[in-house]
Design a protein with these regions (language model features):
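N-terminal core-binding DNA-recognition domain of tyrosine recombinases/integrases
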Residues: 5-19, 29-120, 141-148
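Basic, Lys/Arg- and aromatic-enriched nucleic-acid-binding interface segment
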Residues: 78, 102-173, 177
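Short, charged phosphate-coordinating catalytic segments
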Residues: 89-100, 165-189, 301
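Active-site/catalytic core of tyrosine-dependent DNA strand-transfer enzymes
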Residues: 131-132, 213-276
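Short, basic (Lys/Arg/His-rich) helix/loop patches that form interaction surfaces
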Residues: 142-151, 231, 261-305, 309
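Conserved tyrosine-mediated DNA breakage-rejoining catalytic core shared by Y-recombinases
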Residues: 178-224
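Catalytic-site neighborhood detector that most strongly recognizes the C-terminal catalytic loop/helix
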Residues: 199-201, 307-346
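Short, low-complexity, charged amphipathic interaction modules
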Residues: 345-369
Protein backbone atom coordinates (compact mmCIF):
# COMPACT_ATOMS: atom_id res chain seq x y z
CA UNK A 1 0.00 0.00 0.00
CA UNK A 2 2.91 2.35 0.79
CA UNK A 3 4.46 1.80 -2.64
CA UNK A 4 1.05 2.07 -4.27
CA UNK A 5 0.51 5.42 -2.55
CA UNK A 6 3.87 6.65 -3.84
CA UNK A 7 2.93 5.49 -7.34
CA UNK A 8 -0.31 7.50 -7.28
CA UNK A 9 1.49 10.60 -6.04
CA UNK A 10 3.93 10.32 -8.93
CA UNK A 11 1.46 9.51 -11.70
CA UNK A 12 -2.05 10.79 -10.92
CA UNK A 13 -3.01 14.11 -12.56
CA UNK A 14 0.09 14.00 -14.74
CA UNK A 15 2.27 13.62 -11.65
CA UNK A 16 1.56 17.08 -10.25
CA UNK A 17 2.27 15.79 -6.72
CA UNK A 18 5.54 14.13 -7.69
CA UNK A 19 7.60 16.26 -5.32
CA UNK A 20 5.33 15.19 -2.43
CA UNK A 21 6.23 11.56 -3.07
CA UNK A 22 9.87 12.18 -2.18
CA UNK A 23 9.27 12.30 1.59
CA UNK A 24 7.29 9.03 1.42
CA UNK A 25 10.10 7.36 -0.52
CA UNK A 26 12.71 8.54 2.00
CA UNK A 27 10.56 7.44 4.94
CA UNK A 28 10.07 3.95 3.50
CA UNK A 29 13.80 3.59 2.82
CA UNK A 30 14.54 4.65 6.40
CA UNK A 31 12.06 2.13 7.82
CA UNK A 32 13.57 -0.68 5.76
CA UNK A 33 17.12 0.39 6.58
CA UNK A 34 16.66 0.21 10.34
CA UNK A 35 14.15 -2.65 10.63
CA UNK A 36 15.23 -4.66 7.60
CA UNK A 37 13.39 -5.12 4.31
CA UNK A 38 11.86 -8.42 5.42
CA UNK A 39 11.21 -7.54 9.07
CA UNK A 40 7.57 -6.64 8.44
CA UNK A 41 5.37 -9.16 6.67
CA UNK A 42 2.06 -7.94 5.28
CA UNK A 43 0.30 -5.97 8.03
CA UNK A 44 2.18 -7.55 10.91
CA UNK A 45 3.25 -4.25 12.46
CA UNK A 46 2.51 -2.51 15.74
CA UNK A 47 3.58 0.35 17.96
CA UNK A 48 6.64 -1.72 18.98
CA UNK A 49 8.15 -1.68 15.48
CA UNK A 50 7.30 1.98 14.91
CA UNK A 51 8.90 2.97 18.24
CA UNK A 52 12.01 0.93 17.44
CA UNK A 53 12.29 2.74 14.11
CA UNK A 54 11.95 6.12 15.81
CA UNK A 55 14.60 5.19 18.40
CA UNK A 56 17.01 4.19 15.62
CA UNK A 57 16.44 7.48 13.80
CA UNK A 58 16.90 9.41 17.04
CA UNK A 59 19.93 7.63 18.48
CA UNK A 60 21.46 6.04 15.40
CA UNK A 61 22.88 2.53 15.24
CA UNK A 62 26.38 1.09 15.43
CA UNK A 63 28.03 0.76 12.06
CA UNK A 64 30.54 -1.88 10.96
CA UNK A 65 33.38 0.21 12.37
CA UNK A 66 31.62 0.56 15.72
CA UNK A 67 30.73 4.22 15.23
CA UNK A 68 27.19 5.51 15.62
CA UNK A 69 25.57 6.33 12.29
CA UNK A 70 22.16 7.09 10.85
CA UNK A 71 21.09 9.80 13.29
CA UNK A 72 18.79 12.36 11.69
CA UNK A 73 17.25 15.61 12.87
CA UNK A 74 14.05 15.74 14.89
CA UNK A 75 12.30 17.66 12.12
CA UNK A 76 13.14 14.92 9.58
CA UNK A 77 11.96 12.26 12.03
CA UNK A 78 8.67 14.14 12.25
CA UNK A 79 8.34 14.19 8.45
CA UNK A 80 9.00 10.45 8.18
CA UNK A 81 6.58 9.56 10.99
CA UNK A 82 3.85 11.74 9.52
CA UNK A 83 4.34 9.97 6.19
CA UNK A 84 4.02 6.62 7.97
CA UNK A 85 0.91 7.84 9.79
CA UNK A 86 -0.69 8.78 6.48
CA UNK A 87 -0.03 5.30 5.10
CA UNK A 88 -1.40 3.75 8.29
CA UNK A 89 -4.59 5.79 7.87
CA UNK A 90 -4.87 4.68 4.23
CA UNK A 91 -4.58 1.07 5.36
CA UNK A 92 -7.34 1.55 7.92
CA UNK A 93 -9.57 3.20 5.32
CA UNK A 94 -9.17 0.05 3.22
CA UNK A 95 -10.10 -2.24 6.12
CA UNK A 96 -6.63 -3.20 7.32
CA UNK A 97 -5.03 -2.73 10.78
CA UNK A 98 -8.46 -2.15 12.35
CA UNK A 99 -7.71 -4.55 15.21
CA UNK A 100 -4.26 -3.04 15.87
CA UNK A 101 -3.80 -0.26 18.44
CA UNK A 102 -3.33 3.08 16.70
CA UNK A 103 0.36 3.80 17.36
CA UNK A 104 0.71 7.55 16.85
CA UNK A 105 0.24 10.59 19.05
CA UNK A 106 1.08 14.27 18.65
CA UNK A 107 2.12 14.43 22.29
CA UNK A 108 4.06 12.12 24.56
CA UNK A 109 1.75 9.37 25.73
CA UNK A 110 2.70 6.08 27.32
CA UNK A 111 2.86 3.15 24.89
CA UNK A 112 2.35 5.41 21.85
CA UNK A 113 4.82 6.89 19.36
CA UNK A 114 4.95 10.66 19.72
CA UNK A 115 5.53 12.57 16.50
CA UNK A 116 7.89 15.54 16.96
CA UNK A 117 6.34 18.84 16.05
CA UNK A 118 7.95 20.88 13.33
CA UNK A 119 10.21 23.44 14.89
CA UNK A 120 9.39 27.04 14.14
CA UNK A 121 12.11 28.14 11.77
CA UNK A 122 13.95 31.34 12.44
CA UNK A 123 12.55 33.84 9.99
CA UNK A 124 15.46 35.15 8.00
CA UNK A 125 14.97 38.11 5.72
CA UNK A 126 16.60 41.08 4.02
CA UNK A 127 15.53 44.62 4.82
CA UNK A 128 13.97 46.64 2.03
CA UNK A 129 17.12 48.79 1.88
CA UNK A 130 19.12 45.64 1.17
CA UNK A 131 16.69 44.56 -1.54
CA UNK A 132 16.93 48.06 -2.97
CA UNK A 133 20.71 47.73 -3.10
CA UNK A 134 20.39 44.39 -4.92
CA UNK A 135 17.85 45.90 -7.30
CA UNK A 136 20.31 48.68 -8.17
CA UNK A 137 23.01 46.06 -8.76
CA UNK A 138 20.63 44.36 -11.18
CA UNK A 139 19.66 47.55 -13.02
CA UNK A 140 23.24 48.80 -13.34
CA UNK A 141 24.71 45.30 -13.90
CA UNK A 142 27.33 46.14 -11.34
CA UNK A 143 29.21 42.84 -11.28
CA UNK A 144 32.95 42.30 -10.62
CA UNK A 145 35.23 42.21 -13.66
CA UNK A 146 37.17 39.42 -11.96
CA UNK A 147 34.32 36.92 -12.40
CA UNK A 148 34.83 34.21 -15.01
CA UNK A 149 33.48 34.87 -18.48
CA UNK A 150 29.78 34.09 -18.68
CA UNK A 151 29.23 33.93 -14.92
CA UNK A 152 27.98 37.51 -14.67
CA UNK A 153 25.22 36.80 -17.21
CA UNK A 154 24.07 33.72 -15.29
CA UNK A 155 24.25 35.56 -11.98
CA UNK A 156 22.29 38.46 -13.47
CA UNK A 157 19.47 36.12 -14.50
CA UNK A 158 19.43 34.45 -11.07
CA UNK A 159 19.37 37.80 -9.30
CA UNK A 160 16.45 38.83 -11.50
CA UNK A 161 14.50 35.71 -10.52
CA UNK A 162 15.33 36.30 -6.85
CA UNK A 163 14.09 39.89 -6.98
CA UNK A 164 11.01 38.79 -8.93
CA UNK A 165 10.16 36.27 -6.20
CA UNK A 166 10.30 39.06 -3.63
CA UNK A 167 8.30 41.58 -5.67
CA UNK A 168 5.77 38.91 -6.75
CA UNK A 169 4.35 38.70 -3.23
CA UNK A 170 7.12 36.38 -2.07
CA UNK A 171 6.00 33.46 -4.21
CA UNK A 172 8.24 30.41 -4.54
CA UNK A 173 10.07 29.25 -7.64
CA UNK A 174 7.52 26.51 -8.38
CA UNK A 175 4.93 29.28 -8.73
CA UNK A 176 7.31 31.45 -10.77
CA UNK A 177 7.89 28.56 -13.18
CA UNK A 178 4.12 28.17 -13.74
CA UNK A 179 3.31 31.88 -13.96
CA UNK A 180 1.60 32.66 -17.27
CA UNK A 181 0.49 35.64 -19.31
CA UNK A 182 -3.15 34.61 -18.84
CA UNK A 183 -6.38 36.47 -19.59
CA UNK A 184 -6.20 38.42 -16.33
CA UNK A 185 -2.82 39.84 -17.31
CA UNK A 186 -4.22 41.26 -20.54
CA UNK A 187 -7.54 42.32 -18.98
CA UNK A 188 -5.66 44.54 -16.54
CA UNK A 189 -3.67 46.13 -19.35
CA UNK A 190 -0.58 44.07 -18.48
CA UNK A 191 -0.56 45.56 -14.99
CA UNK A 192 -1.12 42.43 -12.88
CA UNK A 193 -0.74 38.66 -12.76
CA UNK A 194 -3.25 36.17 -11.35
CA UNK A 195 -2.16 32.65 -10.42
CA UNK A 196 -2.92 29.73 -8.12
CA UNK A 197 -0.30 28.79 -5.56
CA UNK A 198 0.98 25.31 -6.34
CA UNK A 199 1.36 24.48 -2.66
CA UNK A 200 -2.33 25.05 -1.86
CA UNK A 201 -4.03 24.49 -5.23
CA UNK A 202 -4.92 20.89 -4.37
CA UNK A 203 -6.41 21.82 -1.00
CA UNK A 204 -8.54 24.77 -2.05
CA UNK A 205 -9.87 26.56 -5.09
CA UNK A 206 -10.51 30.26 -4.65
CA UNK A 207 -8.36 30.55 -1.52
CA UNK A 208 -5.16 29.83 -3.41
CA UNK A 209 -5.60 32.56 -6.04
CA UNK A 210 -3.10 35.39 -5.77
CA UNK A 211 -3.01 38.76 -7.54
CA UNK A 212 0.41 40.31 -8.21
CA UNK A 213 0.47 44.02 -9.04
CA UNK A 214 3.25 44.72 -11.54
CA UNK A 215 4.93 47.73 -9.99
CA UNK A 216 7.50 49.55 -12.09
CA UNK A 217 10.64 47.89 -10.63
CA UNK A 218 9.08 44.48 -11.30
CA UNK A 219 8.36 45.54 -14.88
CA UNK A 220 12.01 46.55 -15.27
CA UNK A 221 13.04 43.05 -14.19
CA UNK A 222 10.48 41.41 -16.48
CA UNK A 223 11.75 43.46 -19.42
CA UNK A 224 15.21 42.10 -18.74
CA UNK A 225 14.71 38.39 -18.00
CA UNK A 226 11.10 37.38 -18.79
CA UNK A 227 9.69 36.06 -22.05
CA UNK A 228 7.88 38.41 -24.41
CA UNK A 229 4.18 38.44 -23.41
CA UNK A 230 2.03 36.02 -25.41
CA UNK A 231 -1.37 34.73 -24.35
CA UNK A 232 -1.00 31.74 -22.00
CA UNK A 233 2.76 31.73 -22.49
CA UNK A 234 5.07 31.16 -19.53
CA UNK A 235 6.61 34.28 -18.02
CA UNK A 236 9.83 32.47 -17.06
CA UNK A 237 10.04 29.52 -19.50
CA UNK A 238 13.74 28.91 -18.85
CA UNK A 239 13.00 27.40 -15.44
CA UNK A 240 11.23 24.35 -16.89
CA UNK A 241 13.13 24.65 -20.16
CA UNK A 242 10.40 22.80 -22.05
CA UNK A 243 10.04 19.72 -19.82
CA UNK A 244 6.45 18.60 -19.18
CA UNK A 245 6.64 15.71 -16.70
CA UNK A 246 6.27 16.71 -13.04
CA UNK A 247 9.30 14.60 -12.14
CA UNK A 248 11.53 16.59 -14.48
CA UNK A 249 9.86 19.87 -13.52
CA UNK A 250 10.51 19.18 -9.86
CA UNK A 251 14.14 18.41 -10.67
CA UNK A 252 14.54 21.56 -12.77
CA UNK A 253 12.97 23.73 -10.06
CA UNK A 254 15.28 22.29 -7.39
CA UNK A 255 18.32 22.89 -9.60
CA UNK A 256 17.28 26.47 -10.33
CA UNK A 257 16.63 27.12 -6.63
CA UNK A 258 20.15 25.94 -5.88
CA UNK A 259 21.61 28.10 -8.66
CA UNK A 260 19.76 31.17 -7.41
CA UNK A 261 20.94 30.73 -3.83
CA UNK A 262 24.56 30.14 -4.83
CA UNK A 263 24.72 33.04 -7.27
CA UNK A 264 22.77 35.57 -5.20
CA UNK A 265 24.89 34.66 -2.17
CA UNK A 266 28.05 35.34 -4.21
CA UNK A 267 26.61 38.67 -5.35
CA UNK A 268 25.81 39.62 -1.74
CA UNK A 269 29.35 38.82 -0.65
CA UNK A 270 31.25 40.20 -3.66
CA UNK A 271 29.30 43.37 -4.48
CA UNK A 272 27.82 45.05 -1.38
CA UNK A 273 30.22 43.02 0.78
CA UNK A 274 27.68 41.60 3.22
CA UNK A 275 28.67 39.05 5.86
CA UNK A 276 29.07 35.34 5.19
CA UNK A 277 26.02 34.56 7.33
CA UNK A 278 23.81 35.97 4.58
CA UNK A 279 22.82 33.15 2.20
CA UNK A 280 19.49 34.27 0.72
CA UNK A 281 17.03 31.73 -0.66
CA UNK A 282 13.45 31.77 -1.88
CA UNK A 283 12.29 31.43 1.73
CA UNK A 284 14.02 34.71 2.49
CA UNK A 285 11.96 36.37 -0.25
CA UNK A 286 8.71 35.20 1.32
CA UNK A 287 9.68 36.24 4.83
CA UNK A 288 11.08 39.54 3.55
CA UNK A 289 7.87 40.37 1.66
CA UNK A 290 5.75 39.90 4.79
CA UNK A 291 8.19 41.52 7.21
CA UNK A 292 9.02 44.58 5.12
CA UNK A 293 5.38 45.36 4.32
CA UNK A 294 4.44 44.94 7.97
CA UNK A 295 7.27 47.26 9.02
CA UNK A 296 6.05 49.76 6.41
CA UNK A 297 2.65 49.85 8.13
CA UNK A 298 0.68 47.76 5.61
CA UNK A 299 -2.29 45.98 7.17
CA UNK A 300 -1.91 42.29 7.97
CA UNK A 301 -5.03 41.28 6.03
CA UNK A 302 -3.53 42.55 2.78
CA UNK A 303 -0.23 40.80 3.46
CA UNK A 304 -1.93 37.49 4.24
CA UNK A 305 -4.23 37.55 1.24
CA UNK A 306 -1.55 38.72 -1.19
CA UNK A 307 0.55 35.72 -0.12
CA UNK A 308 -2.32 33.30 -0.72
CA UNK A 309 -2.93 32.47 2.93
CA UNK A 310 -6.26 30.77 3.51
CA UNK A 311 -9.33 32.86 4.28
CA UNK A 312 -12.92 31.94 5.08
CA UNK A 313 -14.28 33.64 1.97
CA UNK A 314 -16.13 31.59 -0.63
CA UNK A 315 -14.86 33.92 -3.35
CA UNK A 316 -11.58 35.25 -2.05
CA UNK A 317 -10.35 36.88 -5.24
CA UNK A 318 -13.41 39.09 -5.77
CA UNK A 319 -13.55 40.09 -2.09
CA UNK A 320 -9.82 40.77 -2.18
CA UNK A 321 -10.13 42.98 -5.27
CA UNK A 322 -13.11 44.85 -3.80
CA UNK A 323 -11.15 45.54 -0.63
CA UNK A 324 -7.82 46.22 -2.31
CA UNK A 325 -8.27 47.57 -5.85
CA UNK A 326 -5.26 47.37 -8.14
CA UNK A 327 -4.14 50.95 -7.49
CA UNK A 328 -4.02 50.26 -3.76
CA UNK A 329 -2.09 47.04 -4.38
CA UNK A 330 0.39 49.04 -6.46
CA UNK A 331 0.76 51.54 -3.64
CA UNK A 332 1.34 48.85 -1.01
CA UNK A 333 3.82 46.79 -3.05
CA UNK A 334 5.76 49.93 -3.95
CA UNK A 335 6.82 50.00 -0.29
CA UNK A 336 8.90 46.86 -0.90
CA UNK A 337 11.80 48.95 -2.21
CA UNK A 338 13.21 52.22 -0.91
CA UNK A 339 13.22 54.00 -4.27
CA UNK A 340 12.50 57.69 -4.63
CA UNK A 341 10.43 58.98 -7.54
CA UNK A 342 13.50 60.18 -9.42
CA UNK A 343 15.27 56.81 -9.36
CA UNK A 344 12.04 55.02 -10.28
CA UNK A 345 11.57 57.29 -13.30
CA UNK A 346 15.20 56.73 -14.28
CA UNK A 347 14.76 52.96 -14.13
CA UNK A 348 11.60 53.24 -16.21
CA UNK A 349 13.45 55.33 -18.81
CA UNK A 350 16.36 52.86 -18.92
CA UNK A 351 13.90 50.01 -19.40
CA UNK A 352 12.19 51.78 -22.30
CA UNK A 353 15.47 52.80 -23.95
CA UNK A 354 16.77 49.23 -23.79
CA UNK A 355 13.93 48.14 -26.08
CA UNK A 356 14.82 50.63 -28.83
CA UNK A 357 16.86 49.69 -31.88
CA UNK A 358 20.17 51.38 -32.64
CA UNK A 359 18.45 53.39 -35.36
CA UNK A 360 15.75 54.61 -32.96
CA UNK A 361 18.38 55.53 -30.37
CA UNK A 362 20.30 57.48 -33.01
CA UNK A 363 17.15 59.38 -33.95
CA UNK A 364 16.63 60.32 -30.30
CA UNK A 365 20.21 61.56 -30.03
CA UNK A 366 19.84 63.66 -33.16
CA UNK A 367 16.68 65.24 -31.77
CA UNK A 368 18.45 65.98 -28.49
CA UNK A 369 21.29 67.70 -30.33
Amino acid sequence: IWREYIYHLQHDDNGKRYSTSESYISALKSLQKFLGKDAIKGFNISVVEIQKWKDCMTNGVKGKDGNIEGQISESTIGIYLRSCRTIWNVCRSQGYLLDVTYPFSNKKEKHLVSIPRSKVKKKVYLKREQFTELYNVFVNKNYPDTWKKGYAERAHYSLGLFLAQYLCNGFNLADAARLQYNDYYFQTGKRAFLFNRKKTADRSSNDSEVVIPIIEPLQVILDEIAATPSRDGYVFPEIFNGVTSEKERSKRTAEENSNIQDRVTKICHDVPGWGKAIRPSGTWCRHSFATNLRNAGVEKTYIDESMGHSTNSNDMTNVYLDTYPLEMQMEYNSKLLALDDESTQRDELISKLSKLSNQELLQLLNKAV
